[in-house]
Structure formats: C-alpha cells, structure tokens
Amino acid sequence: MAAQGFLLIASFLLILLVLAKPLGSGLARLIAAVPLPGVAGVERILWRTLGITDHEMNWRQYLLALLTLNLLGLGILFCLLFWQEWLPLNPQRLPGLSWDLALNTAVSFVTNTNWQAYSGESTLSYFSQMAGLTVQNFLSAATGIAVVFALIRAFTRQNVHTLGNAWQDLVRITLWILFPVALIIALFFIQQGVPQNLSAYQPITTLEGAKQLLPMGPVASQEAIKMLGTNGGGFFNANSSHPFENPTALTNLAQMLAIFLIPAALCFAFGEAAGDRRQGRALLWAMSFIFVVCVAVVMWAEVQGNPHLLAAGADSSVNMEGKETRFGVLASSLFAVVTTAASCGAVNAMHDSFTALGGMVPMWLMQIGEVVFGGVGSGLYGMLLFVLLAVFIAGLMIGRTPEYLGKKIDVREMKMTALAILVTPMLVLLGSALAMMTDAGRSAMLNPGPHGFSEVLYAVSSAANNNGSAFAGLSANSPFWNCLLAFCMFVGRFGVIIPVMAIAGSLVSKKVQPASQGTLATHGALFIGLLIGTVLLVGALTFIPALALGPVAEHFSLP
C-alpha cells in the first residue's frame, strides 16, 4: 500500500510539472502585458469594441475595477437565483431560491468559494447553472489571477505607480487561458461519459424494477471550469463522487491535475517575470513539501481502518466509509488533500467520514490560508504574504532591513501583510465561537461532541478561506448559517485582496536595490525551510487550541 501511495503521488506531481511549465511561460507573457502569438490583432478589435483603453491603473483604480465587476456580478447572480422560476431553460420547473440561500450562493460563487447549501439537481435550473454559476466560475478565477498579476508586477517594476490595466488583464486571462484550457478539459470529460445536454431529466427502470429519475444537464462544461478555476461547486449534490461528474479513474486524475495546474504554472510564471526562475521554483518546492507530507498523513490515517468497525470485530483493513469503490482509499485521500490545499472544495469522497486525523489535515490546510498551491491567483499571493513575513523575521534575526527581489519591505508593507494574514483566522475563530454560542448555530449540528464541533469549525474554515468543501453533518441551509457563511466568504475574499493590492501599490513605486553580501538569498534551501516554518508556525499558533477541541479530542476518544 505504501509503494502504491508513493507511486500515485510521484506520478501526479510529475505530470503536473510537465503540464504547468509551458502554461507558466504563457502566463509570464500576460504578466508582461505581451500578447500571446497570433492574438494581437484580435485584442485590438476587442479593445475598440469594448471601449477598453491602454491606460494603466494605479492600485486603487485596479482594485476599484475588480470590486466593481464582482459586486455587479453578485447582484446579477442573486437576481437570477431569486427569480429563477421566471427564467428560461428550466425543464423541471424549479422554483426560485429563498433570499438567504440566493444571497449565500451568489456570494459563494462570486468569491470563488462555491459553498453549496443546496442540492444542485433539485434546486437550480440549467439557466442558473450556465448563465449564473458557470459565468462566475470564470470571472472569480480571472479576478484572483489578475490580483496576483498586479502583485508580481509590483516586484518586477520600479519607480512607477501603475500595475497594468485590470480590464485588459481580465479579458486576456479569460479568453486566452481559462476558456481554451477549460474547453479541452470539457471535451475530454464528454469523451469519458460526462453529460452535456439540455434535456429534461430521464425516467428509467432499474435492474430491480424500481423507477428512477436521472438528472441531465450541461455538466461537462461546468465541471471543467469548476476544477480549472479552483471553484469546486458541483452540478450535482454528490459533487465529484457522482458518476455523471467524475465517471472514471482518468477523469479523477484529470480533475486533480486541473485543480493544481494554474497555481503551479503561476509559480513558474513568477520566476520568469522576476527574471530569476529560482524564485518561482523555491515557492514550488515549499508548497510541494507541505503537500506531500499532508498526503502521506491522510493516506496513513485512512489505511488504518475504521476504529469503530475494528472495535466491533468487523473486517475493516482500510476506511472505505464515504468513499467510492471506483477510486479507493489512496486516490480519495489524494483528492481530499488536493482540493483543500487548493481553494477548490470539490470532493470525490465524504470528508465527514474520514478518520479524525484524516479529516483534520484537510481542515488545517484550509486554515493556514490556502497557500499550498492554493486557489488560482489567491494561492500565490497568499504564499507571497508569508514570504514577506519570513523575510521580515529573517531581517530581525540578522539586523538588516528586510528585502525581497531587491525591494525594501517597510512598515507599511508589514502592516498590510499582518492584516491580510490575520483576516481569515479571525473570521474562523470568531465565526465558530458565534455559532457555538447561539441556538441557531448549534441547532444545525447533527452530531454531538468533538465531531460536531469539528463540523462547525470545518464549515467556517471552508467559508472564510474560500474553499467550499464541508463536513456534511451540518444542516447549513438556514438564515443564520447562510448569512454567517456569506459574511465570512465575502470578507475572507476581499478582506485579503484589498491589503494585497495596497502592498502592490506601495512596492511598485520603490527602486530595486542591487544585491549585496548581506542580502538574504530567497531561492535556496535555507529560505525554503524558513518559509515552510513560518507557514507552520502561524498555523500552529492560531489553530491548535481549536483543533484540540475537535479532531484531536475525537482521535483520543476513539476505541
């Protein structure tokens, strides 16, 4: 089993790196605002048609453009969901959503979280899925990538005040990166058996003679961008464990690769844009180390078997509860770590049925800020925040003003870094405390004791860090939970983006200082270790008390 797990991890990472490197070169061209080959003429026509100028924006203008797009999308999506019954492509005649569920869902998809307090096949029409959710899957992913583009330019430019044109970046990211790659993935899914139609649900008779209604819909197109954009919201309630979303072992592998593809490619793009590929590789090494350790822990925990079944004398050599037999324990464990290391949230197994330690690792990966590869764009700018913190700590130890890529890190940058890093932990801890203190929060818990608390902690961690996965033993479709999690999702997304853009605005105007003998090398093994230690230290200090009350207590209470 250990050899199989090692081979699975190694194969996955090898294929990922082979695919990510050329995509990273394309992303680096977009960061430098250089059109991809053959599209310059098309872009000129687009700019004239859409009224987009070549005028570059400072950080406030860039941020305002992104906020305007997202708030407009939030309002439109809310209206689509609320008045769904009056809109076309609704063959099942599904009613509109309640105001609180429509708000929660709109915020969820605009913030790239894709938390779902509903069952897709029994709640949403095809029009809502296509014109509402799928559109936001593209736009929310493009927003995250645009933010990291601006931050990378802040490190590579000097003595200027502009970070690029947000509208041009959004169009280029969507048309030249997200759409073509998603199209290729969607066609592969269709070939593997994922439905792509607008047919009404199909009544069938099973082999046992029972009547059943099979849901249909444009699944493949949404599934592709759901994974590529690290969105994670499933067309069906069972998400990627549903055979219509993830029918084969090949689609399972493709989905995991799609989740990590752009986050890994952005590391390569960062190195190319910075003029030193070692900088991008250092971040990739740090992310990969944490990722591999986490996968190993989850695989080990899940192959130990279910303690309750073992105590009852049952044959439980591995913990198969909540897992699909077509994937097995190892692939399900790998998928769980991939989807929570990135801010995807798609699942091919029930995380609530993992062992206590097996479920704790995905929860902790979310709590440290989704920086182990992370979401498209958000993972890299989240890790760069930890880079600035690590550089600052190193500067304190050696008595030098901290620098990164030749840019001095001053008080303003560190204040914004601290604010951005602390936003999500505050939301998680305060939100969980509020839920446990109120009757409305506790009434949603379907399990008592440490596991019930773990379900609450997981839900708020998932929302605040824009992941979207869940321990499903929580009845979250209530006004209290819909509003609480919508608030956590919105602040967790834009409460980090705003200080990140402020950091970019401050750094871009600074001069690049030449390296000296005392300059800390940020591409070697020493700095990689310091960066990993910084991530682990912040995660440990912040969440160990909460984790001790949940999964750790549950683990020690097992038979």
Curated annotation (Swiss-Prot):
Pfam families: KdpA (PF03814). Its main location: membrane. Signal peptide: none annotated. The chain crosses the membrane at residues 5-25, 27-47, 63-83, 132-152, 170-190, 253-273, 283-303, 327-347, 356-376, 379-399, 416-436, 484-504, 524-544. One of its GO terms (molecular function) is P-type potassium transmembrane transporter activity. The keyword Cell division does not apply. Keywords: Cell inner membrane, Cell membrane, Ion transport, Membrane, Potassium, Potassium transport, Transmembrane, Transmembrane helix, Transport. It comes from the Bacteria. InterPro entries: KdpA. HAMAP family: KdpA. NCBIfam families: kdpA. Belongs to the KdpA family. Part of the high-affinity ATP-driven potassium transport (or Kdp) system, which catalyzes the hydrolysis of ATP coupled with the electrogenic transport of potassium into the cytoplasm. This subunit binds the periplasmic potassium ions and delivers the ions to the membrane domain of KdpB through an intramembrane tunnel. This is Potassium-transporting ATPase potassium-binding subunit. It comes from Salmonella paratyphi B (strain ATCC BAA-1250 / SPB7).
